[in-house]
Amino acid sequence: MATFPPLPMTHTRLAILARQKLPCSSKKIPRAQLIKEKEDIDYYLEQNFKGLSKEEVAAHRNSYKKSICVDMLRDGFHKSFTELFALMEQWDKLPEAAKAQSLFWQQRPLEDQPDKLDNFYHYLTRAEAAERKGYYEEVYNNLYALACYFDNSEDKWVRNHFYERCFNIAQLIKADGGKKEAEAESHMGLLFEEEGELLKAAEHYEAFHELTHGRLWKDGTGQLLNLVACESLVRTYRLLSDRMLENKDYKQAIKILIKASEIAREGNDRSMEGEASYYLGLAHLASGEYETALTVLNRYSEISTSLDDDHGLGRAYEAIAKALQSQGETTEAINYLEKFVTIARNNLQSLDMIRACTMLGDIYNEKGQYSKASEYFQQAFSTAMELMKTALMDETKVHYGIARAHQMMLAMKGYIESADSNGLNCLLSWKETRTQIEYDPILGESRRATEDNIYQLPDAEEETRRSPENQ
């Protein structure tokens, strides 16, 4: 069979270059030739595909993250590139650090989040341009905008980085009288507070408070910066005092809470002043200074009353009752706890209700008034049942059971002391059935009672029977 000669094929320059680089080619191409061929391809694309520039080709060839870095360098923002590159390196190390701690890392890589890269480019380059001109307030504003953009649980470390940058730049701003410096101190205080370094947080909040003292500066929400400083400082002092109280360092805890109370009064905020008084009163109570605790807690009670703050008033009554009980003044303590129960019931504060009823039950149980104790423990148990909290149900159930047992104890004691067959039969009958004991008038009302009668036994009679003289 006759064969036809092969048809002549014409190839473009681009196709020729591409075919020469196919992996099936056995020809080894030197590096210099590869670079030249790349330049030839770029030139060919630029000449034959109008509207597709060399930069556009690079944009399609490179990742978006690399393109952002290239743009920064091409536009002359070398400091911005250095800062962004360092943040990128740290970002890439986060999954490895999480894996070392056996944590599941869910955050996407930075190259998959173009919006964040755009914000980096926009604000970092603007900040660098302003810094070159000496416009430090504009530098601060751009860096703070980045801190606000990254203020979320995933990127908090990025936010903290820009908080530190803002703090350093704020030291150079003198035209605003120190307002930016005060804001930067506030942000650094928050940074350390969230990390649990309360002493460093207190230092920054103290500087924030000092810079805003006597100033009418306001934040973005219209709140006075001095009030924000007072609130931040009082909160940090309280957290520090909690640690001191855990370590039984009552003197230092009281000392720092007194400072918190003074700052709260300076802020002219009655609610904050009341909170400071409450925690100071608790510190005095923990240290055994009951009279001082009562004085401070009564002030908190007065403030809560003036503010119509039922929750605060209930807390005040609870703490005052504890102080009175520690002094042995149980009657006064009962009065305050009954007020606490009323407030908790009216405001549907179930946990407060359980706590108040349990405290009342304990007091009546110690006094030997078992009917009252059983009544309050039953209220606590019923409230815990409504909440369906297993731990609370178990605890209140035990208290209620003990109070019921104490009620029955007097009836059992009466039957045992009767020392006759009727009393013995009643005891045996109860042991077999564990039901309510039927009252037998033959045994006499003076020394014996059924379980029903014991539940309604006057508290005075119970206390008399329990007294050492009667025993």
From Swiss-Prot:
* TPR repeats (start-end): 92-131, 136-173, 182-215, 234-267, 274-307, 314-347, 354-387
UniProt cross-references to SUPFAM superfamilies, sorted A to Z: TPR-like
Free-text domain note:
The TPR repeats are required for axonemal localization and flagellar beating.
Task: List the gene name.
Answer: Ttc29
Species in which this protein is naturally found? Mus musculus
Q: Name one Pfam family in it.
A: TPR_12
According to its UniProt record, where is this protein mainly located? cytoplasm
Respond yes or no to whether keyword Iron is given for this record.
no
Name listed for the protein in its UniProt record: Tetratricopeptide repeat protein 29
Q: State the function annotated in the UniProt record.
A: Axonemal protein which is implicated in axonemal and/or peri-axonemal structure assembly and regulates flagellum assembly and beating and therefore sperm motility.
Region annotation Disordered: where it falls in the sequence? 449-471
Quote the tissue specificity entry: Expressed in spermatozoa (at protein level).
The cellular location(s) given in this protein's UniProt record come to: Cytoplasm, Cytoskeleton, Flagellum axoneme
Q: What UniProt keywords are attached to this protein's entry?
A: Cell projection, Cilium, Cytoplasm, Cytoskeleton, Flagellum, Repeat, TPR repeat
InterPro entries in the record: Bac_ResReg_Asp_Phosphatase (IPR051476), TPR-like_helical_dom_sf (IPR011990), TPR_rpt (IPR019734)
Task: Give the highest taxon in the source lineage.
Answer: Eukaryota
**Phenotype reported upon loss of the gene:** Knockout mice generated by CRISPR-Cas9-mediated gene editing display minor morphologic and ultrastructural defects of sperm flagella, which result in profound alterations in sperm flagellar velocity and beating frequency that strongly impair fertilization.
Taken from the UniProt entry, a GO cellular component term is: cytoskeleton
BP term (GO), one: cilium movement
